[in-house]
Regions:
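Glycine-rich, acidic and aromatic/proline-enriched surface loops and short helix-turn segments
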Residues: 85-89, 129, 133-136
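Bacterial N-terminal signal peptides
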Residues: 7-19
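Short, contiguous alpha-helical
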Residues: 43-47, 54, 64-105, 142-190
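A non-catalytic, amphipathic alpha-helix used as a structural packing/dimerization or gating element
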Residues: 44-48, 52, 118-126
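Positively charged n-region of N-terminal signal peptides that target proteins for export
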Residues: 1-5
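N-terminal low-complexity, Pro/Thr/Ser-rich intrinsically disordered segments
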Residues: 27-40
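Helix-adjacent hinge/juxtasegments
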Residues: 100-123
């Protein structure tokens, strides 16, 4: 009984002491990074959404670009065209231009995988350039969302479209799985 109590005490002591030493080591090795500026935070999120959708656009087999999990859904390429075309609601307003038409680009306008990939990349590059050009002050400007006709900050519109891109990323991850493939973000890191 005494040996069990001593063993328990030793384990308890180690459990309480070791995490403290690990935390002290972490505190010494890592300095706190400053928070990004508001426009930098938007840019980082925008670029992350773009990286994920671009990786999917580049990775998905071209012979499956019109794949639909069910007949009622958009094809893989149509999902990408819809999501990335919507980015221009932000970009056009940020640059003082007219927003794109309500309808999605037609698949026959983007006949090849390379055409779709180029559109995805350009959409995110144009948005990133607009965010950089606007900076913190410009991203705080008030605009009217063409869809809801509600006034909002330009940064809020950008975040709304980042969220929209995330929704379509999630849908496309399902397309991958139904097609028997593994999405790039779900693969083991090399």
């Amino acid at each position: 009984m005494m040996k069990s109590a001593l063993a328990f005490a030793a384990i308890l002591a180690a459990t309480l002491v070791l995490p403290g030493h690990a935390q002290d080591a972490m505190k010494k090795d890592t300095a706190v990074k400053p928070a990004p500026s508001p426009s930098q935070a938007v840019l980082e999120s925008w670029n992350d959404a773009g990286r994920k959708l671009t990786a999917m656009a580049e990775d998905f087999p071209e012979d499956k670009y019109d794949f639909k999990p069910t007949p009622a859904q958009r094809g893989f390429a149509e999902q990408l065209l819809h999501a990335t075309n919507a980015n221009y609601y932000f970009t056009s307003l940020a640059l003082g231009q007219k927003p794109p038409a309500e309808e999605d680009p037609k698949r026959d306008q983007f006949k090849t995988k390379a055409d779709v990939v180029a559109f995805v990349k350009k959409s995110f590059a144009d948005g990133a350039a607009a965010i950089k050009a606007k900076g913190d002050k410009g991203m705080s400007e008030l605009v009217v969302d063409p869809g809801s006709h509600q006034q909002m900050r330009l940064s809020d519109l950008a975040y709304g479209l980042i969220e929209h891109d995330g929704e379509h990323y999630g849908q496309l991850a399902v397309y991958y799985r139904v097609a028997g493939l593994v999405p790039p973000e779900s693969r083991p890191k090399k």
